[in-house]
């Protein structure tokens, strides 16, 4: 069987997108795979002949596979890797050892988490979700009540790969939303892996017999099915990767602030509405020095906690660090030099760590005492909970690992095991003996050239080595007459060059054989010693991951303190129950780029629902987002951008701010808006913060007003959530006279000599001006259009009819005709745009003969008219 035939046979065994097959010192790709890889990785394509046919071929050196593999997988490809081995008979065999996928890639160059997600929906409606980050060993599971819950968590975790359960594979709506809101690769894993029996066995096998009971979920429920499918998928792809995953943790709505996917987007927590990270809340407050610290801060921002004790602990730590500038600087310097210990530990546990990885483990553990010293010797941190972070790790075990690595590893190890020189002298007696013998032979070889020059009396002689000729003596052709050819010390010619001749001799051959034997034995022994060392480190991966998480937490706390100190943020007072009082609050992102006008926000039992009016572009949306972000930051454990803040803890933050058509899901702007509103009305509680902006604007005016009015009443009377409701429906301001906790506030503007100035100040009371035409002028709309708009606006204010009923009873939009001075329907027909039924009643009223109609008959007629009008 030819190489290409073998490649194609192996490719048929896997459903991976690409196959990398080891052929000697290279991993080769053939046929269509070669073209794909060459295009993605910018490799040269050559041709390989096979049975008279020619096939494209591209390859990478064995020692360089990892970065190329990562580049392919990070672009969404699943790559099978076939290794070669030699049998006892000397034959070469190849078989697929692993499949590397977007969710099982260990060697990721991206600092962000890299989750594999499995999602299960049961017939009863419950959802189960499992999220595994094999690069750090994290495995988290949760239950969802509906599709919105599932989408929220998938948006939050942003997995690299998703395994939808059998019931979801035909759910086009769910899959469409998943493709739209994440960049995940969708993989249809073996449906049997989601079976309750197989999944339960997998979970218990990986985490222990009692683990399911500790999770508090049903053994045959969707959570365990999702977890088991994820474990099975990883095992099928690469069994070794599972060694990094030793703990499984549940999470649920009760331990964190609910932030649905819409809210995360609207508040621009990790990316802006345009898709980039610059300008997001996280990018603004992230001053972390390490990749792990950045991941920890991102987790806090996207999953704020409801744990009051944890919030108090974080706030106290941030406050103390904010007052300790020298300690922050010292910690920043140390943390900036450490490596990603969580990921390094996972690679060690899976058997994938190389010498450089272990060297980085050693250096990171060596920094641990420096971090501890900065935390414990700084007076400002004497009572700080920041000190307690490192108390939660086994520093003695970590010190043992560091000491063993320091004794074992050379300071500058080679890139690959085959090069040798990984381990220090004195680490292993047998290795030291081999190295000493090797040095003796090398010393003889190093002195051979000078000895032969002296013996033969020539100058152009050198001793060297290459893969083809081994060790050789090279003599310039002008001096070859001096080369000995007798029995004693005779040279044997091995290659003729243009200007020189290469020779060997019996004594050189003997030393070469010994050098090669020693090098082979040394390489094999070093591989064994290194593998044993790596295994011992991997066995303590849990300790190392704990240390990595502790360092990440310190880094995140220092980052929050740095931002608080640099921007004059204050520690908010956290209280149970409702109530929100912010003095001179600011938006944390906007204040970085513009001169910001601070605003107060006051919410209590008598003003927990605030209707916000004001001109377009005046800052209503910024103000409302500002309030929401300040509340969120408080429950991250951060200080907040304000002069003072008293914040009642919330169980969720829900927003509906703007909407775009979701064409992939076939849903219009208004449908998206109503779905988001429905989610809020069902999910929010009296402990929630709700932010609504322009509800009802996606439909006809009267429909929109009606929906906004009814939603306001429901939120006020039934949900009783703290609410900000921005609107241009000025009719809603009348609700303040009818609902006891509704108040009106507005963003002020000043109009003088036809010019409008937006003051950005929030004041009590309502406004009935939107200044939309003024905004159009600011946006550069042509002056004739703006002038015409002003004229239409003036006439519209005189006649308030906007919508009418058509002749067939359907709703139609009425359009004001400035030239005629009246309204026409949307077909352009002149008319009063009144209800035809009402017009008929009016006609009958005009013809009633009052003098000839008895009071009883008149009463009956009026009753009939009323019935007709109500219908």
From Swiss-Prot:
This protein is involved in the repair of mismatches in DNA. It is possible that it carries out the mismatch recognition step. This protein has a weak ATPase activity. InterPro entries: DNA_mismatch_repair_MutS (IPR005748), DNA_mismatch_repair_MutS-lik_N (IPR007695), DNA_mismatch_repair_MutS/MSH (IPR017261), DNA_mismatch_repair_MutS_C (IPR000432), DNA_mismatch_repair_MutS_clamp (IPR007861), DNA_mismatch_repair_MutS_core (IPR007696), DNA_mismatch_repair_MutS_N (IPR016151), DNA_mismatch_repair_MutS_sf (IPR036187). The keyword Magnesium does not apply. NCBIfam families: mutS1, PRK05399.1. SMART domains: MUTSac, MUTSd. This is DNA mismatch repair protein MutS 1. GO terms for molecular function: ATP binding; ATP-dependent DNA damage sensor activity; damaged DNA binding; double-stranded DNA binding; mismatched DNA binding. Keywords: ATP-binding, DNA damage, DNA repair, DNA-binding, Nucleotide-binding. Belongs to the DNA mismatch repair MutS family. Gene3D superfamilies: 1.10.1420.10, DNA repair protein MutS, domain I, MutS, connector domain, P-loop containing nucleotide triphosphate hydrolases. Transmembrane segments: none annotated. GO terms for biological process: mismatch repair. ATP binds at residues 614-621. Pfam families: MutS_I, MutS_II, MutS_III, MutS_IV, MutS_V.
């Amino acid at each position: 069987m030819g190489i290409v035939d073998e490649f194609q046979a192996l490719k048929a065994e896997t459903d991976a997108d690409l196959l990398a097959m080891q052929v000697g010192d290279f991993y080769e790709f053939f046929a269509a795979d070669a073209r794909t890889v060459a295009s993605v990785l910018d490799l040269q394509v050559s041709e390989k002949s096979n049975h008279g046919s020619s096939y494209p071929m591209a390859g990478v050196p064995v020692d360089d596979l990892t970065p190329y593999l990562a580049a392919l997988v990070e672009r969404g490809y699943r790559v099978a890797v076939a290794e070669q081995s030699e049998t006892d008979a000397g034959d070469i065999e190849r078989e697929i050892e692993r499949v590397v996928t977007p969710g099982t890639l260990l060697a990721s160059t991206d600092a962000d988490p890299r989750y594999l997600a499995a999602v299960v929906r049961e017939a009863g409606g419950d959802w189960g979700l499992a999220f595994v980050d094999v690069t750090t060993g994290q495995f988290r599971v949760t239950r969802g009540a509906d599709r919105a819950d599932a989408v929220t968590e998938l948006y939050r975790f942003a997995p690299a790969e998703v395994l939808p359960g059998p019931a979801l594979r035909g759910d086009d709506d769910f899959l469409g939303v998943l493709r739209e809101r994440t960049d995940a690769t969708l993989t249809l894993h073996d449906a049997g892996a989601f079976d309750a029996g197989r999944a339960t066995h997998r979970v218990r096998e990986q985490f222990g017999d009692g683990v399911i009971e500790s999770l508090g979920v049903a053994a045959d429920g969707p959570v365990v099915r999702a977890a088991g499918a994820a474990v099975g998928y990883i095992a099928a792809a690469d069994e070794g990767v599972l060694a990094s995953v030793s703990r499984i943790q549940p999470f649920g709505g009760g331990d964190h602030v609910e932030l649905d996917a819409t809210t995360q987007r609207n508040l621009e927590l990790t990316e802006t509405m345009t898709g980039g990270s610059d300008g997001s809340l996280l990018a603004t407050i992230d001053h972390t020095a390490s990749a792990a610290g950045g991941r920890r801060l991102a987790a806090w921002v996207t999953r704020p906690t409801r744990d009051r004790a944890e919030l108090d602990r974080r706030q106290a730590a941030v406050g103390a660090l904010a007052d300790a500038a020298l300690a922050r600087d010292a910690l920043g310097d140390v943390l900036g030099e450490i490596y990603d210990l969580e990921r390094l530990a996972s690679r060690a546990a899976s058997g994938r760590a190389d010498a450089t990885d272990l060297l980085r483990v050693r250096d990171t553990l060596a920094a641990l005492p420096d971090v501890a010293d900065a935390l414990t010797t700084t007076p400002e941190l004497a009572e700080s909970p920041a000190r307690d972070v490192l108390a939660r790790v086994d520093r003695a075990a970590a010190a043992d690992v560091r000491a063993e690595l320091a004794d074992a590893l050379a300071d500058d190890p080679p890139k690959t095991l085959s090069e040798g020189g990984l381990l220090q002298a004195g680490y292993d007696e047998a290795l030291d003996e081999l190295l000493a013998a090797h040095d003796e032979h090398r010393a003889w070889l190093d002195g051979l050239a000078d000895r032969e020059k002296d013996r033969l009396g020539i100058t152009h002689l050198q001793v060297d080595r290459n893969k083809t000729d081994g060790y050789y003596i090279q003599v310039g052709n002008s001096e070859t007459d001096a080369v000995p050819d007798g029995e004693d010390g005779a040279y044997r010619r091995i290659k003729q060059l243009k200007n020189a001749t290469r020779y060997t001799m019996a004594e050189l051959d003997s030393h070469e054989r010994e050098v090669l034997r020693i090098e082979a034995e040394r390489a094999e022994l070093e591989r064994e010693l290194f593998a044993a060392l790596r295994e011992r480190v991997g066995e303590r991966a849990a300790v190392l991951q704990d240390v990595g998480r502790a360092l990440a937490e310190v880094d995140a706390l220092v980052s929050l303190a740095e931002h608080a100190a640099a921007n004059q943020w204050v520690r908010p007072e956290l209280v149970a129950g409702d109530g929100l009082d912010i003095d001179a609050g600011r938006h944390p992102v906007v204040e970085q780029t513009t001169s910001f006008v601070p605003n107060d926000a006051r919410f209590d039992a008598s003003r927990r629902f605030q209707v916000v009016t004001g001109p377009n572009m005046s800052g209503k949306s910024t103000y409302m987002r500002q309030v929401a972000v300040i509340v969120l930051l408080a429950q991250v454990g951060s200080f907040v951008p304000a002069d003072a803040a008293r914040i009642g803890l919330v169980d969720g933050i829900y927003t509906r701010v703007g909407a775009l058509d979701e064409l992939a899901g076939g849903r219009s702007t208004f449908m998206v808006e109503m779905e988001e509103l429905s989610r809020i009305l069902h999910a929010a509680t009296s402990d929630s913060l709700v932010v609504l902006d322009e509800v009802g604007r996606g439909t006809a005016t009267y429909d929109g007003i009606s929906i906004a009015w009814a939603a306001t009443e429901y939120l006020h009377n039934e949900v009783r959530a703290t609410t900000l409701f921005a609107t241009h429906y000025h009719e809603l301001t009348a609700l303040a006279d009818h609902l006891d906790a509704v108040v009106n506030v507005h963003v002020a503007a000043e109009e003088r000599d036809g010019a409008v100035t937006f003051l950005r100040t929030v004041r009590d009371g309502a406004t009935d001006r939107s200044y939309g035409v003024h905004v159009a002028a600011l946006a550069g709309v042509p002056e004739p259009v703006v002038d015409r708009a002003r004229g239409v606006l003036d006439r519209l204010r005189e006649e308030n009819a906007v919508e009418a009923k058509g002749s067939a009873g359907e709703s139609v939009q009425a359009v004001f005709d400035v030239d005629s001075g009246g309204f026409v329907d949307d077909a352009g027909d002149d008319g009063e745009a009144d209800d035809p039924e009402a017009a008929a009643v009016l006609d009958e009223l005009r013809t009633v003969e009052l003098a000839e109609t008895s009071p009883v008959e008149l009463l009956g007629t009026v009753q009939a008219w009323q019935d007709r009008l109500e219908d």
